[in-house]
Design a protein with these regions (language model features):
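Compositionally biased terminal segments of proteins
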Residues: 1-215
C-alpha cells in the first residue's frame, strides 16, 4: 500500500472502527491477496444498518486527521457518503466514506478492519456493473485469475449484494472493456498483450452471458 494511503487508512479506521467502518474498495481486494495495483484513494465503508451513525463517523475521521497534523477539506457530504481531500502539505488524496451492504463481519488485519473478501469482491462486481472503470475490470480479472472465485461465484455474490442485478445489463457493462481508452488501463500497468488478453476474457464472458439469456 502507498505509505500516505496507509497513514490515511490507519488513522481513519482508528477513528471510525467503533462505527463499524472497514477498509473497502481496491485496497480491500488487495488485502485479500487478489490483486496488486496503484490506487487513487482510500475507501472506508460501514454497514447499512449503521447508517444513522454516519455523520458522527465522518466528524470523528475528520478530527482524527487534523489531530494527526493533516489538512482536511470536505468536498461532498450526504446522508450516507462523504468525500474528503486530505493533504500533508506535499501530497493530496481522496478519502471516501460510505455505507454499503455486507454479508460478513470485517476481518481484523494489521491496518485495521478490512472487508471480508466475499464482500470486497461483491462490491467490485457492483462497481463493474454500475460504472465499468478500467480499475474495476482489472480487479475482477485478477480475482478470477487467482482461482479463488469462478465467474458463477462472482455472479452469485453480485446478486446477493444487489437484488436488482441483471445479467444482461452486466453483459453490456462487460462490453466497455473494449471501449475504454488503452491509457485508462496503462495507468495501472496493463498494456499491450496483457490488455488484449484481459479484453478477450471479458468478451468471452459477455458472450456466455448473452447466450445464457437467449436459451
Amino acid at each position: 500500500m502507498d505509505p500516505f494511503h496507509e497513514r490515511l487508512a490507519r488513522t481513519g479506521l482508528g477513528a471510525a472502527d467503533r462505527y463499524g467502518f472497514a477498509l473497502a474498495g481496491g485496497y480491500a481486494v488487495q488485502a485479500a491477496g487478489l490483486v496488486e495495483r496503484p490506487s487513487e484513494d482510500v475507501d472506508l465503508f460501514t454497514a447499512w444498518d449503521r447508517r444513522d451513525e454516519f455523520t458522527a463517523a465522518v466528524a470523528a475521521v475528520v478530527n482524527a486527521y487534523r489531530d494527526d497534523g493533516l489538512t482536511v477539506e470536505t468536498e461532498r457530504q450526504y446522508d450516507t457518503f462523504a468525500r474528503l481531500a486530505v493533504t500533508d502539505g506535499v501530497r493530496v488524496s481522496k478519502v471516501e466514506l460510505g455505507v454499503d451492504w455486507r454479508a460478513n463481519e470485517p476481518i481484523l488485519m494489521a491496518i485495521g478492519p478490512v472487508l471480508h473478501p466475499d464482500d470486497a469482491v461483491a462490491n467490485k462486481m457492483s462497481a463493474l456493473y454500475g460504472r465499468a472503470f478500467a480499475r474495476d475490470f482489472i480487479d475482477i480479472d485478477a480475482t478470477l485469475r487467482s482461482g479463488r472465485y469462478t465467474r458463477d461465484a462472482l455472479l452469485t455474490l453480485a446478486k446477493r449484494a444487489d437484488r436488482g442485478f441483471d445479467p444482461r445489463i452486466f453483459a453490456d457493462a462487460l462490453g466497455q472493456a473494449t471501449q475504454l481508452d488503452p491509457d485508462d488501463f496503462a495507468q495501472y500497468g496493463v498494456t499491450g498483450p496483457a490488455l488484449d488478453k484481459l479484453r478477450g476474457r471479458f468478451a468471452q464472458w459477455r458472450r456466455e452471458l448473452l447466450d445464457d439469456e437467449e436459451r
